[in-house]
Amino acid sequence: MATNSTKACPAPMKATSNGVFQGDNPIDFALPLAILQIVIVIVLTRVLAYLLRPLRQPRVIAEVIGGIMLGPSLLGRSKAFLDAVFPKKSLTVLETLANLGLLFFLFLAGLEIDTKALRRTGKKALGIALAGITLPFALGIGSSFVLKATISKGVNSTAFLVFMGVALSITAFPVLARILAELKLLTTEIGRLAMSAAAVNDVAAWILLALAIALSGSNTSPLVSLWVFLSGCAFVIGASFIIPPIFRWISRRCHEGEPIEETYICATLAVVLVCGFITDAIGIHSMFGAFVVGVLIPKEGPFAGALVEKVEDLVSGLFLPLYFVASGLKTNVATIQGAQSWGLLVLVTATACFGKILGTLGVSLAFKIPMREAITLGFLMNTKGLVELIVLNIGKDRKVLNDQTFAIMVLMALFTTFITTPVVMAVYKPARRAKKEGEYKHRAVERENTNTQLRILTCFHGAGSIPSMINLLEASRGIEKGEGLCVYALHLRELSERSSAILMVHKVRKNGMPFWNRRGVNADADQVVVAFQAFQQLSRVNVRPMTAISSMSDIHEDICTTAVRKKAAIVILPFHKHQQLDGSLETTRGDYRWVNRRVLLQAPCSVGIFVDRGLGGSSQVSAQDVSYSVVVLFFGGPDDREALAYGLRMAEHPGIVLTVFRFVVSPERVGEIVNVEVSNNNNENQSVKNLKSDEEIMSEIRKISSVDESVKFVEKQIENAAVDVRSAIEEVRRSNLFLVGRMPGGEIALAIRENSECPELGPVGSLLISPESSTKASVLVIQQYNGTGIAPDLGAAETEVLTSTDKDSD
């Protein structure tokens, strides 16, 4: 008997091989085979994610499809492939790695749920969450009777009803966050409602899942299920008293900007594993313990964020895809055969959609949410994802769901998530509303009435450029005559594959910026918060913070839309290079350059690109300490007039001395510096108009400089464009800031355009930041809004490439 048993059971796999040269096949050993499986999974899911990117689908769709493709539904139909890559004897190792990844992923998911924020959830979000759970849960129980009578005969009735109810009522919180971010709804009112409701739904789903697991044990005695459930409750209560104080103590010893001690990280991961072991021993599931630890860890301070940074990439990128493969190996679409099976698939899918959408729609309309937004909320709340797969896999492992029911439920989850993005894009288009709101008067700094409020939208990627940017804004506020200055500080955050980059919206408030209004400002407060709050309080400038979370390929749309909605006169963008210690400029990120170019092409107002070379030093300068020398290099044309208008605004500040350099052609060289051909009467008329406007503003500058000591006017006659312009710059090389137009007009500017190495800065800006330039001052390059949507001299081919994406999106 022992011999027969030995023959029936394959020998366990050894960990490592001796190598092919000693006759070993690497895939007959556990470690090389696991490596091969991981590589195949990662490559396949990433390729699918890339292919689905134009459809703006979340990565979970690609991972689910990839898992199904590797299973018996497609590639797994080949016995040779299945035996070679996913042999049965390797599945224990594969599922162990997958569940370990799942354990830590659920810990991260718990970290992203702020219990204090849940307690502050408004009536609207709470009502939407409850309706989105109860109605689909009830309908799920109803449809489960049909399934049980047809394809799921003989299963535990109570457990089956609860599993089906949970599976149909779940909203995938992380997946919803990514969809909202992709659709640029993350920080809108509808986005905040959806996220708050989904967070409540998520917690309720875990409670129901724990109940379902307790009811689905192999022991038929209801007393055992009761003990499992009560033990789980006791674990949660005990952890609630023990875990928060310990981690609050750890968090107080971790400081912003300083590395977190390895001891704290290792101790936390050990606690996660221990709690996972305890809940597994109770009979719930190890992931439940990990999730509870994540929820209970206090979110204040840098410790929670540091944990995510340490764990997330390895778990989400390496281990978690294995869970989708383990799920895909159990999914056999071929089991769905015949009219009955496909009819049941339609029934389950319709029930899931109908319950979520109708429940959400009814409550939304009761709260007087507009119909279009209510329908959008319904489809958003219908998003499924990893949590759905977890429920289904637990049901499959516990023999509550058979192969056919499991396949039907997986396809239902895939379909409901897949349709969310296109339906929401069709139903709810906030861009339409932005276009209606798009008419406003002051789209440039240059204007007839200088007493009107100047609205600036300043953008930044990180904390490094904040001091100089604030010093620039301080210099721009003038003397607060008229309506003063209003600043919109837009934090540009890249929408990466990392869920933590998206789920920070837990902290978003009505101002739209997640890191702005943290409770209390202490030593650990973010330096960005401190800097802007200090500027707002000391300079009495109205600063309104916001955030934009988007991919670098279309974040320019967020910038332009925000400029329209906030009626900005000028958008100030950081240059894509930063200054090094030796004074040279190094590229921060190449895609920042393309963001700037796209904004130059599509901006609804004037645009400034700020080359930061340490304006005011490395710290914020208070109003009384401002002492800057600002130089405007004026050649002519609308961009130069816009730069001069900005300079005159700065000159109102008591700490600013403005020097205006006007470059004119020497009378002996008129027409000789460059040969200008006028192609038509329109260009000739425009040139005459620009020349007249230039002369008018120069006449005004002469008058101002004669009565105001803070404004100096210097006129330079040019004979050799390149040499004489460099010579003029040499005279004021010790200035703090240069203001220049991006595309200056006039004969001299045309002569130096050939030397423009950086089209977005124009010829003069490129000259000022070139290695040969004698000045190391900061530079603000300004393009005046012209109303045509054309940014000259960005290159025809480049312009076509930059705008093609936006045409496609329209």
UniProtKB/Swiss-Prot annotation:
Alphabetized GO MF terms: antiporter activity
Residue spans crossing the bilayer: 29-49, 59-76, 91-111, 126-146, 157-177, 193-213, 223-243, 277-297, 314-334, 343-363, 374-394, 406-426
Pfam families in UniProt: CHX17_2nd, CHX17_C, Na_H_Exchanger
Keyword Ion transport (UniProt): yes
Membrane topology per record: Multi-pass membrane protein
Signal peptide: none
A GO CC term attached to the entry: late endosome
Domain of life: Eukaryota
InterPro entries: Cation/H_exchanger_TM, CPA2_transporter, Na+/solute_symporter_sf
Location of Phosphoserine modifications: 804
First-listed, main subcellular location of the protein, grouped into a coarse class: membrane
Record key words, sorted: Antiport, Ion transport, Membrane, Phosphoprotein, Potassium, Potassium transport, Transmembrane, Transmembrane helix, Transport
Gene Ontology biological process terms in this record: potassium ion transport; proton transmembrane transport; regulation of pH
Tissue localization of expression: Expressed in roots.
Transmembrane listed as a keyword: yes
Location within or outside the cell: Membrane
UniProt xrefs under PANTHER family: CATION/H + ANTIPORTER, CATION_H(+) ANTIPORTER 18
Function: May operate as a cation/H(+) antiporter.
Family membership noted in the UniProt record: Belongs to the monovalent cation:proton antiporter 2 (CPA2) transporter (TC 2.A.37) family. CHX (TC 2.A.37.4) subfamily.
Protein name: Cation/H(+) antiporter 18
Lineage, highest ranks first: Eukaryota, Viridiplantae, Streptophyta, Embryophyta, Tracheophyta
Designated gene of the protein: CHX18
